[in-house]
Curated annotation (Swiss-Prot):
UniProt KW Ribosomal protein keyword: no
Limits of the C-type lectin domain: 229-353, 357-500, 504-641, 646-795, 799-937, 941-1095, 1099-1230, 1235-1376
Source taxon at top rank: Eukaryota
Subunit and partners: Interacts with sPLA2-IB/PLA2G1B; this interaction mediates intracellular signaling as well as clearance of extracellular sPLA2-IB/PLA2G1B via endocytotic pathway. Interacts with sPLA2-X/PLA2G10; this interaction mediates sPLA2-X/PLA2G10 clearance and inactivation.
Any single Gene Ontology cellular-component annotation: receptor complex
Post-translational changes noted in the entry: The secretory phospholipase A2 receptor form may be produced by the action of metalloproteinases. It contains all extracellular domains and only lacks transmembrane and cytosolic regions. It is however unclear whether this form is produced by proteolytic cleavage as suggested by some experiments, or by alternative splicing.
Domain notes: C-type lectin domains 3-5 mediate the interaction with phospholipase PLA2G1B. The endocytosis signal probably mediates endocytosis via clathrin-coated pits.
Role played: Receptor for secretory phospholipase A2 (sPLA2). Also able to bind to snake PA2-like toxins. Although its precise function remains unclear, binding of sPLA2 to its receptor participates in both positive and negative regulation of sPLA2 functions as well as clearance of sPLA2. Binding of sPLA2-IB/PLA2G1B induces various effects depending on the cell type, such as activation of the mitogen-activated protein kinase (MAPK) cascade to induce cell proliferation, the production of lipid mediators, selective release of arachidonic acid in bone marrow-derived mast cells.
Designated name of the protein: Secretory phospholipase A2 receptor
Matching PANTHER family: MANNOSE, PHOSPHOLIPASE, LECTIN RECEPTOR RELATED
Originating species: Bos taurus
Membrane-protein topology: Single-pass type I membrane protein
Amino acid sequence: MPLLSLSLLLLLLQVPAGSAETAAWAVTPERLREWQDKGIFIIQSENLEKCIQASKSTLTLENCKPPNKYMLWKWVSNHRLFNIGGSGCLGLNVSSPEQPLSIYECDSTHVSLKWHCNKKTITGPLQYLVQVKQDNTLVASRKYLHKWVSYMSGGGGICDYLHKDLYTIKGNAHGTPCMFPFQYNQQWHHECTREGREDNLLWCATTSRYERDEKWGFCPDPTSTEVGCDAVWEKDLHSRICYQFNLLSSLSWSEAHSSCQMQGAALLSIADETEENFVRKHLGSEAVEVWMGLNQLDEDAGWQWSDRTPLNYLNWKPEINFEPFVEYHCGTFNAFMPKAWKSRDCESTLPYVCKKYLNPTDHGVVEKDAWKYYATHCEPGWNPHNRNCYKLQKEKKTWNEALQSCQSNNSVLTDITSLAEVEFLVTLLGDENASETWIGLSSHKIPVSFEWSNGSSVTFTNWHTLEPHIFPNRSQLCVSAEQSEGHWKVKNCEETLFYLCKKTGLVLSDTESGCQKGWERHGKFCYKIDTVLRSFDHASSGYYCPPALITITSRFEQAFITSLISSVVKTKDTYFWIALQDQNNTGEYTWKTAGQQLEPVKYTHWNTRQPRYSGGCVVMRGRSHPGRWEVRDCRHFKAMSLCKQPVENREKTKQEEGWPFHPCYLDWESEPGLASCFKVFHSEKVLMKRTWRQAEEFCEEFGAHLASFAHIEEENFVNELLHSKFNRTEERQFWIGFNKRNPLNAGSWEWSDGTPVVSSFLDNSYFGEDARNCAVYKANKTLLPSYCGSKREWICKIPRDVRPKVPPWYQYDAPWLFYQDAEYLFHISASEWSSFEFVCGWLRSDILTIHSAHEQEFIHSKIRALSKYGVNWWIGLREERASDEFRWRDGSPVIYQNWDKGKERSMGLNESQRCGFISSITGLWASEECSISMPSICKRKKVWVIEKKKDIPKQHGTCPKGWLYFDYKCLLLKIPEGPSDWKNWTSAQDFCVEEGGTLVAIENEVEQAFITMNLFGHTTNVWIGLQDDDYEKWLNGRPVSYSNWSPFDTKNIPNHNTTEVQKRIPLCGLLSNNPNFHFTGKWYFEDCREGYGFVCEKMQDASGHSINTSDMYPIPNTLEYGNRTYKIINANMTWYTALKTCLMHGAELASITDQYHQSFLTVILNRVGYAHWIGLFTEDNGLSFDWSDGTKSSFTFWKDDESSFLGDCVFADTSGRWSSTACESYLQGAICQVPTETRLSGRLELCSETSIPWIKFKSNCYSFSTVLESTSFEAAHEFCKKKGSNLLTIKDEAENSFLLEELLAFRSSVQMIWLNAQFDGDNETIKWFDGTPTDQSNWGIRKPEVYHFKPHLCVALRIPEGVWQLSSCQDKKGFICKMEADIHTVKKHPGKGPSHSVIPLTVALTLLVILAISTLSFCMYKHSHIIFGRLAQFRNPYYPSANFSTVHLEENILISDLEKNDQ
């Protein structure tokens, strides 16, 4: 039942007051089609071409334009016609039937509201028909016949939109249908509504007035196929199947079947004993009998499941006798009975169970490959069929003897896995004049479970009428197949029959199929799809489909065709002509074959309410009831065509003889029906754009030419080819071969490959512009003259039968497909997610990320074409930990999402890590355990260039004063001194442009570290050169090959909650300077209009001089950064030696506790060029690590997941990343750190024990015994009060560090704990419950806006990241109790006072930055006095208490002597 929001519809139709009937309102066929899909239509007089409009008193005929809401109608319950605008139903006063018709309350009793449509008439009671009087008013009459159609539907009638009952779920109406319309809250609803429900579920009343009767139920939600297991479903965690137990409903079998179908589900099927036990458990011990999907309603077949599950498991009630088994055709399940299945009268009313698959591709997928023809070679006496060989043994044997006989011939007793194999069996038995044969299906179990003797899964069953009929007390049951339709019967295994053996054959090449290239063979015929849309007259002429359109003679042929057309179906509006036509307008449809001969119809496959009318021609649907036949207008309707011709004894037409057989070579592209192949050479794939002549020469090196268009189909293909690669909004222009360069051609345009010019491709206005002699092609089917010397991208063309040459400079990359600045490689073979992560990484790419709807559409179209049937493909989404948020593996932000609603999460207790996938059928995303095997896609942002690149050595140059040297760049950090210096993103970019640069493009981890280390001591974030509308490309045009996106709050948009508002906000890249190491240096998107600092970049000026890296100034042994002093030790040493050496220098092996110092050391190590020992080690094989100087910190910087398990001692490599190795290993250096203060032990003696243990820190005691308790905020608060304590508060940074260190052990078990904070509405601030302000806070990227704070929200600490988060006070979380210590034993150690240190804020490390001037004189590079004080709101929760001081920068110790001189 289509559901439409009444409020939305009325809003669309509303016009300004006073002009409701007169205001112009544009209606397109698309809009009408949307309404019609929802059952809403406009009634038009076929003869008068006017439309029915309702008013308060009468109905009149008015001009259809402009339409309004009072013209909209809908069939509703009890055959009533409901007017949308008037909120009433069409009624007839039977006591005075000649008076004008009017609109009445839909539950009126004094008028008749029932109407029927009969072809094009509207008929009421006593055969009264809706007629029109001369004054255009509507009346009821028996005298005249007036015809009505649906406006703008191509002549369709209003009978096409009949109402279909919606059976309710749950509620109190026992499953009875919704009553439409029903009145609720003084409003008539013609559809289900969410009004009045907090859970937002759709519901309806089952009587006309809800307030009077209060009968209601939930609606079968058509969107539930996308939602998964919602509130009215229960999920089997193991099978990912949802079940709906409607135990309070009472419906017939067909009504129950309809109810399930409306939810994208089916009546219960039971595939095996495990599933039966699951259902039995949920039904309990009550003797309730429920409908399931088992039925024998197909008169020509036996018992089957309504969802096409193979029927090989059976558990019939043993006392079943033959008579009711024959009489009753629907199956029930009774959990109270061990033998739970029973047949019943299908009209009985019972409860029912629905079933749907969370992943529909797991079920019901027809093997398309089963219908593909494979030429096969077999031994003499064996019959070939699609890769297998069969032999009917005409010596009668029992089933077991037949099995042994086949095995002795290296074959098996045949299995049958598809309808295609059934057709072969029928043909073979017919040729052998045999009526029946044993097949390899048998059961040896109780309950009965049929299995194939070769061990293959039972994926298809084809039972005979009344089968499978189970013999009681029979331990072994065997199955035979009969000849007429290939149906199966259960037999006594001791009977003797012929038997069919099967074994693998030798598959021959496709050329031996007997069909031309592009045609598919089935039986003795070849078939082809002409994908060009044509009228029936053109399609059936014999020219495009020689010799004729297809005739279909059996269900097997129909199934083959249904499979064939699925490969080209793109939209629900895809149709295919077949040869069926009512040529004489008699209403009788016959086949129109070659020679205009009429052929009788032996088989039909009509769709619902078909054939609709006489005189039409027949199409086959491509989607939504695929393969079903429908009547369409022969002249005006356009469709593809299905062609058919015999394999042998055919005469080739002239067109067929010239048909190009060759596929395109390498990575050239074409489509069926085109004689040439094309290749687009665009700027991302070549080293440079070219002039027209250069482009033509480029094509000629392949043996090709610039593209020409021999006919419109070639232009259409090229146009679609461009659309498949580039954004439609891009104004790209490509050289093609169209030119008028030849002076002897009198200025006429010609194609460079000699193709005749068959159309005027250029507008007349362009003729005469003599200087523009070459044409470019735009992706909107436009050709423009251009100057031949301008440089463009280009398109080449080559005949199919010509193999392209391979120029020596060409780098072949065929498997990769380009789309919008990235390339994709589709791996069809299935494997685990981690395998593809490795493969993609090895190919210098990443597992697929999807960042826009266009990219989603591109991926979906490709995997749909590559998947033979419904297949899921891995994408790059993965949980870092079970139940964590999904993140792109390459670190890019998750901005665009296309989750199948409810399927991004595991619904059960399974803690396995999950990864994301995309469905080839729906294109929607869902998640699955990462160990499952699926195909996948690699994506590389660095596009492979097909031309071999000539290496041009880079040269270092100079930077202006005030800029920092990094590699070949100059960087300028602009840190505002106050709010007046803040700049928005656009202003920052303008400033950079004025300085000859752009906002920075961070190209690698070392550059990221260099910028981060220079932000130390400042409090502002900085803009970088990214925008959200193209965040895969830097502002300077380079692709984003390195990224450092924040895993939290990637989009940081305050005060805007709706997606619609967010779309209007420009978002730009910001680099965070939050001291919490989870956020330091991370990127996220911020409103471009906000003010921050920024970083500019430009290339060094190498025009004056350059310098060799050997001229770099050496790094000194002692370095100061922040309030720390580092010593670099250069010598071959083990970790133990490094530890002793540091002690000899009055230092310790370095401990790294935040991202700033990590970034500083990253820059140093990259400059030095080899790995160094640091002070981290483990004594428990990598389970936990400690710093050798006793520092406690949760900060880590591991290289990868495995790098912490390779040894007991840790080093930092040249990228700064940590790895463990054997402590006895020799490295070339170590990093020492000089202690700067007396360290304080945070853990003193335990507090005196009560009923729970306490840990003391400073003057407080803490109980961590309740961290794993899961309770609400109020319950946690009360628990602590009873223990004489309070719920946890965090008053300073040291306390925060202590707590997070203690909580580290719990991070895998609990995610969040409660904090004892509350929202002060008067001051709009967060306060601790004791009234003190929250000076120490850690909200991550930014503090939530005031509007987020609501009475029912509480504050929790998220343990893995150390950030605070708002959460419902009713959520279940762990907690910590805190109280003051009885005795304060903490002795305060005198700390050092403020000191001034020299640190290199602008350390230019890997900075092959060097200035070479002839004087080679030296100059000191000085910087002004800078304060490194951290403000309270930017405290680092993990950083040990430290004394930050004011420092001076003396000189950059990493720049070269020459560089110093140049400054």
